[in-house]
């Protein structure tokens, strides 16, 4: 039987394996040389680790937004300009059960997992179009998939609707056909919308 050479393991494949492990054991910021068993603080709960994972993704988004601002002069745009790019990005609404008023855990978890799954096509677009550190986008894409799997474990009836392949191909073709200005605006809007969605998700996880 042929053995697998370590030289065939790509950085992305390594990241995928590492992030899948995070689904059951999240990394948490502890002082060098300490772990959860040696730290004087209390052990982190599953909810705490979920929050840390969301914050990890938010950190990646912040880094990408800063990179766009510093390297491509694409900083915070006005809402009016962003609104011109009428993407159907997932958003939180009162009916989704994620707000403190009218909170419903099962409904909220369904919204978060479905919304993050819908964001995958836009992250795929970023992976192809972003003119910067693509490894950060790949890591963020994998991390959101891991987060979906984690949250599905908390659901009574874990079902996530996936985008239709034909509709997905059509949307990607439409996004890729845009001019350079619209591509940059779309990239910024996707990052900002995912950031907003995760911020709402983080608040919801805190009251679960």
UniProtKB/Swiss-Prot annotation:
The keyword Glycoprotein applies. One of its GO terms (molecular function) is growth factor activity. One of its GO terms (cellular component) is interleukin-6 receptor complex. One of its GO terms (biological process) is glucose homeostasis. Glycans are attached at residues 71, 184. Component of a hexamer of two molecules each of IL6, IL6R and IL6ST; first binds to IL6R to associate with the signaling subunit IL6ST. Interacts with IL6R (via the N-terminal ectodomain); this interaction may be affected by IL6R-binding with SORL1, hence decreasing IL6 cis signaling. Interacts with SORL1 (via the N-terminal ectodomain); this interaction leads to IL6 internalization and lysosomal degradation. May form a trimeric complex with the soluble SORL1 ectodomain and soluble IL6R receptor; this interaction might stabilize circulating IL6, hence promoting IL6 trans signaling. This is Interleukin-6. It comes from Equus caballus. The gene is IL6.
């Amino acid at each position: 039987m042929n053995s697998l050479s370590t030289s065939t393991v790509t950085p992305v494949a390594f990241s995928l394996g590492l992030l899948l492990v995070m689904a059951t054991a999240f990394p948490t910021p502890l002082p060098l040389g300490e772990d959860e068993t040696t730290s004087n603080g209390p052990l982190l709960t599953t909810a705490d680790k979920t929050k840390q994972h969301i914050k990890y993704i938010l950190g990646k988004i912040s880094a990408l937004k800063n990179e766009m601002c510093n390297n491509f002069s694409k900083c915070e745009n006005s809402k009016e300009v962003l609104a011109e790019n009428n993407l159907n990005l997932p958003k939180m609404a009162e009916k989704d059960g994620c707000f403190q008023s009218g909170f419903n855990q099962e409904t909220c978890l369904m919204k978060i997992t479905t919304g993050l799954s819908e964001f995958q096509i836009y992250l795929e677009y970023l992976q192809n179009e972003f003119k910067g550190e693509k490894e950060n986008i790949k890591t963020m894409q994998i991390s959101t998939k891991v987060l979906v799997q984690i949250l599905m474990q908390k659901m009574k009836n874990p079902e996530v609707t996936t985008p239709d392949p034909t509709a997905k191909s059509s949307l990607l073709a439409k996004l890729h056909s845009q001019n350079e200005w619209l591509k940059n605006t779309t990239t910024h809007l996707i990052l900002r919308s995912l950031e907003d969605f995760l911020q709402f998700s983080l608040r919801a996880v805190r009251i679960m």
